[in-house]
């Protein structure tokens, strides 16, 4: 069925607050951005990744179907309701033995009964001495079925579901890379952290710190409207100003918490190798999401963390800027990383 999408592919990124989509089309031998858009969701339709307002969600998905004029899609599942488990496996065992090992140990690692879980696995890094890491992604089957029913009731056929972190890695990690990276996806209400070896996600987690946390801190400190606080966050950020309202102190206070969360994950990765093959250290941090382009944030984190921190490039596996310039701005493209990674999954390009 994936061959049906050889000339057009759409990724749909569903979160608590909005649905973003991006479709890619073939132009000769190249991929080009075809359509993209975002629809806000009313409060309570999705909460913590769980669907509570299915009828409203279906209505929004129907609008998206009309806009992209496609039936087949790739769709993200919520990071806060999904798990990635890393296990060290001995060499030279069959895939059936892999599955049995996963089933045996899964309930020890995630709070889902094995009979109620859907999971997939892929090979991670290899140790010549110990074996290799098996990376298993897990989600509750009923949650996946909720999303499937909503999509099909809207007339969309999901070819594949995958975790947000996996779609992000496909979008922003250069194909064939073996770099070890931390991806920080800064959304409105939360930030998602993932650690990748090449394009494979080994660890993923979330914290309730996002763009709205920053905006509310500015609003409280400077006594401005939330709209003005968001404007200050996006236009001035961590750049110091001699005159006028300066959100530096407000943003630093929240950015320090974000920095500490990054430090915790760096420390865990670099110092914990129990049950997994020996790890090489993380070499860089990539920022994405709707709040990744706050002026001065990457530079602040670089100076404190001691690693190179930069905005991600979601076009790295799609197009060359020498050949074409996408119609999205850089700020917009950072919001659509997950949707673009999903579209790549079913684009017909050899990414998987």
Could you tell me what each predicted segment is?
Residues 1-105, 145-147:
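Non-catalytic, solvent-exposed interaction/assembly segments
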Residues 2-39, 71-78, 172-213, 218, ...:
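Gly/Thr-rich phosphate-binding beta-strand-loop-beta motif of the actin/hexokinase/Hsp70
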Residues 46, 142-167, 200-242:
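Glycine-rich phosphate-binding loop plus the immediately following alpha-helix
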Residues 61, 69-80, 151, 156-160, ...:
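Short glycine-rich phosphate-binding loop at a beta-alpha junction
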Residues 76-173, 284, 316-317, 335-338:
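Active-site neighborhood for divalent-cation/phosphate handling
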Residues 220, 231-281:
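Adenine-nucleotide phosphate-binding core of ATP-dependent small-molecule kinases
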Residues 277-310, 314-316:
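Glycine-rich phosphate-binding loops at beta-strand->alpha-helix junctions
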Residues 292, 310-352:
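Glycine-rich phosphate-binding/hydrolytic loop that grips phosphoryl groups
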């Amino acid at each position: 069925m994936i061959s049906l999408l050889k000339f057009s592919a759409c990724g749909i990124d569903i979160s608590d607050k909005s649905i973003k989509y991006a479709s890619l089309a073939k132009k000769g031998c190249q991929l080009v951005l075809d359509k993209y858009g975002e629809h806000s969701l009313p409060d309570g339709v999705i909460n913590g990744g769980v669907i509570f307002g299915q009828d409203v969600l279906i209505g929004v998905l129907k609008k998206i179907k009309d806009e992209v004029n496609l039936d087949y899609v790739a769709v993200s599942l919520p990071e806060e309701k999904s798990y990635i488990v890393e296990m060290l496996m001995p060499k030279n065992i069959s895939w059936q033995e892999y599955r049995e090992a996963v089933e045996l140990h899964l309930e020890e690692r995630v709070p889902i009964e094995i009979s109620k879980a859907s999971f997939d696995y892929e090979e991670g890094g290899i140790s010549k001495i110990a074996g290799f890491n098996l990376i298993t992604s897990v989600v509750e089957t009923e949650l996946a079925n909720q999303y499937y029913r909503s999509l099909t009731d809207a007339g969309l056929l999901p070819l594949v579901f995958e975790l947000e972190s996996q779609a992000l890695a496909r979008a922003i990690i250069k194909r064939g890379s073996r770099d070890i990276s931390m991806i920080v996806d800064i959304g409105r209400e939360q930030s998602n952290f993932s650690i990748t070896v090449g394009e494979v996600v080994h660890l993923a987690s979330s914290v309730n710190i996002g763009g709205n946390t920053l905006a509310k801190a500015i609003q409280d400190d400077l006594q401005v409207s939330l709209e003005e606080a968001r404007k200050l966050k996006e236009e001035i950020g961590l750049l110091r100003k001699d005159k006028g309202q300066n959100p530096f102190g407000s943003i630093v206070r929240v950015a320090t918490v974000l920095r500490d969360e990054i430090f915790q994950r760096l420390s865990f990765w670099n110092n914990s190798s129990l049950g997994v093959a020996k790890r090489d250290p993380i070499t860089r941090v990539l920022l994405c999401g709707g709040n990744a382009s706050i002026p001065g944030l990457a530079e602040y984190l670089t100076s404190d963390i001691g690693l190179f921190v930069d905005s991600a490039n979601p076009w790295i596996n799609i197009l060359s800027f020498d050949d074409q310039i996408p119609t999205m701005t850089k700020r917009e493209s950072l919001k659509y990383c997950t949707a673009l990674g999903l579209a790549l999954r079913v684009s017909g390009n050899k990414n998987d």
